[in-house]
C-alpha cells in the first residue's frame, strides 16, 4: 500500500518542481520583460518573486528528495533512482547558486544602478548586471534540463 503512495508522491513532486521551472521561464520571465519598467525595477520585482518562490520551491525540493529516497527504500533501488540521486544534489546546487548568488547580486546591482550619482556610474552597473543576467539565464537552462531529467527518472522508477 505504501509503495504506490510513495511513488506517486515522488512523481507528483518532481512534476510540480519541473512545472514551476517551466512556468517561471516561459511565463514569468517574458511577462516581466513585457512590463514598461526599467531593467533595475524589473530585477527588483524578480527578486521579490524569487524570495517567495524560494520558500515554496525549497519545500518542494526537500520533499522530492525525501520521497525519492522513500521510493527506493520501499520498492527497491534501481539504475533510474541512482541516476536521480546523482542529479538531485546538482539540482539543489543550481537552485542555491541561482538564488543566493545570482538573485542577490542582481538585486544589489539593480539597486546600485538606481541610486547612481551619475549616468556613467549607472551605465557601469547596468553592464555588470546584464552580464550577470546572461550567466543567470544559462544556469536557468541547465536547471530546466536537470529538472526534466529528474522528472523523467522519477516517472520511470
Question: What is each model feature region?
Answer:
Residues 1-157:
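Polytopic transmembrane helical bundles with strong interfacial aromatic enrichment
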Amino acid at each position: 500500500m505504501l509503495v504506490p503512495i510513495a511513488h506517486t508522491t515522488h512523481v507528483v513532486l518532481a512534476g510540480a518542481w519541473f512545472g514551476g521551472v517551466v512556468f517561471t521561464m516561459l511565463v514569468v520571465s517574458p511577462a516581466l520583460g513585457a512590463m514598461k519598467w526599467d531593467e533595475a525595477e524589473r530585477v527588483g520585482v524578480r527578486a521579490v518573486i524569487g524570495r517567495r518562490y524560494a520558500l515554496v520551491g525549497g519545500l518542494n525540493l526537500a520533499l522530492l528528495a525525501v520521497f525519492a529516497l522513500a521510493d527506493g527504500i520501499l520498492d527497491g533501488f534501481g539504475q533510474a533512482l541512482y541516476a536521480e540521486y546523482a542529479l538531485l544534489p546538482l539540482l539543489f546546487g543550481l537552485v542555491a547558486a541561482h538564488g543566493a548568488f545570482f538573485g542577490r547580486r542582481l538585486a544589489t546591482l539593480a539597486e546600485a544602478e538606481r541610486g547612481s550619482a551619475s549616468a556613467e556610474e549607472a551605465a557601469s552597473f547596468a553592464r555588470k548586471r546584464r552580464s550577470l543576467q546572461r550567466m543567470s539565464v544559462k544556469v536557468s537552462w541547465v536547471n530546466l534540463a536537470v529538472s526534466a531529467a529528474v522528472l523523467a527518472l522519477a516517472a520511470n522508477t
